[in-house]
Amino acid sequence: MTELHEVVAQREFAYSRRDFDRVSRLLFERAGIRLADSKDAMVYSRLARRLRILKLTRFKDYLEMVAHNHQEQEHFVNALTTNLTSFFREPHHFEALSTYLKQHPNIKRIWCSASSTGEEPYSIAMTVASVFGTFTPPVTIVATDIDSRVLQKAAAGIYSANGIEQLPPHYRQQFFYKGKGAQLGKVRVADELRRMVQFETLNLMSPTWDIESPIDIIFCRNVMIYFDRDTQRKILSRMVKLMTPEGMYVAGHSENFTMYPELVRPMGKTIYRPVN
């Protein structure tokens, strides 16, 4: 079996363990994400596309460019960021959101901190619109992501029709337009729903966040798993400081923050309340 430190002969571009290690360092510096050795093939596949576009022949040259070119740093992070999502993924979170909104009708602000291609913030918006019975509720929904490319897709709000098949019929009818002609097989989020969500680029590793507070609800699902424990605690601490005392913090199914009792306390399955 070929070891990671060896150059794989059949690959289009020379790619060594040293290259992988440098990719890992650069990604951690720019986004705070640590790469496991098992991500070797994924790194090669995604970054090889950038080498082809830039007409480069060596990973070494590409990584030199990344180190000194701000625009390419953005492409680099975008290429290596995993974006897996769907409408109403982990549905118990949206049931909890609906209940919370009914119990706290005066909330003002919801932050979806890992928007990806938009399915999560639009699921939040559908829940908010349903509870308040209007597309103009007194709630601001801000959706951020480090990946500017996926935010463009999110703002456009165009998806495969297959992606909404699992939604209730009245949701499909109320919140989506069916595509016709060249757009057959696609759907677009209703304009009224799209206007409920503000999409912005934000890196959770940045020393400052351009996000208004106080925040009543934070969705930060399946993001912290990419950070080491020290980084997790720092980000969670910063988020909690932005929240209202009765706020709701929603984590991903594989994330557990019970080891931070000084920051949050459980109030449901992967749902927490800030300790203020």
Put a short name on every predicted segment:
Residues 117-134:
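Conserved SAM-binding loop of SAM-dependent methyltransferases across substrates and taxa
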Residues 217, 258-276:
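Core SAM-dependent methyltransferase catalytic element
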Residues 109, 134-219, 223-231, 256-258:
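Extended basic-aromatic, gly/pro-enriched interface segments that bind polyanionic ligands
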